[in-house]
Every structure is written in structure tokens, then in C-alpha cells.
Amino acid sequence: MKKHIAYVCADAGIPVFGTKGASIHVQSVVRAALKAGHRVTLFATRFDGHVPPGLENVACVHLPEIPQGDPTKRAHAALEARDHIAERLDAHAPYDMVYERYSLWSDVGMRWARKHGIPGILEVNAPLIEEQRTHRQLVLEDEARAVAQSAFSQASAILAVSPGVADYLHTWPGTKGRVHVVANGVDPSSSADSAEL
């Protein structure tokens, strides 16, 4: 059955129409959904560039921009953007499923799906809090952990891109039995089935 899927990428570091690895990954997931016959509305903080081939029929919704500069100000801006993201999801509903790429400051897609009684599929590509602490600058750690716990606990299913990421996810309360390892992109229609619709 054809579904309307809301794909949420609130990570300001990922230009979803760009050429970096994360950008290509987003495009691959959206293409898989389209190939399966579904309709996708793509919500992203950054698009950048032209619409990639094969994605011309995807509805694109811009999320609030996050200012450059001071990491703490950026984090606060991203946290404050969550209400606006929920409003934009409201404006384009209804959906059959929400698919969110986990980002440091957003649990909006999973909260929205839970509130509206539809499956929420969370794709986790890395232990972002630990990566931020090790390779960049981790600010507002308590808030980042609260966002992660909210997203992980409210997702119908959590897709880990590797066994290592799955192991990390299993260290969080309430994730047992909901983590599935799916490498390099996924067909959201089969993910929805795994979430026991």
C-alpha cells in the first residue's frame, strides 16, 4: 500500500542535496521509498544545490536555519527550532510514517509520530554525543542526552547502520528489542513492517 512518509533531517551539518556521505545516504533512503511506490515529504534544515536526479517529485520543506558561530548559541537555536519543526510537520500532514535521521538536538519526528499514533522510524548513524565530545565541542550535554533518550524511547523502531552503533544503542534504557541493524540505507516500507504496524 502506498504510504506518505515524512523524512526529517534536522541536522544543520547535512546538506541533503549535497555530495558528502551523509547527504548521499539521505538521498538513497528517499529513493528507496520512492522506488517502493511511496510519497515522501522531505523536511531538512539544509538542502543546498540542485535537486538530485530521481528526487524531482519529492516535496521539500525547509526547517528553521541554525546560525553559524558559537556552539552554545547554535545548540540553543536548534533546541528552540523544535516547536517550529512540529508546526511544519502539522502543516503537511497526514502521514503514514515518520522517518527521522537522528541528530544531536532533535527528537521532533519521533515525538510527533508517537503523538499522532503512527510508526516512527529512527535511523542512527553514529553515537553523536560521544563523537561530538571527542572530535568537536560538546555543549549542553544534559540537553543532548535528554533529546537522545526521548528520541530512542519514542521510536517504534531504531535502525542502526552497524553492529557497533547497535551496541551503543543497547546502552540506553528502553531500546531492547527495537534496534535493527540495516547497513547503508533502507527501504522504509520494510522498516515499517519491522515496527509491527
Where are these regions (language model features)?
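Active-site proximal beta-strand in glycosyltransferases
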Residues: 5, 113-131, 159, 180
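Carbohydrate-associated surface elements
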Residues: 46, 164, 185
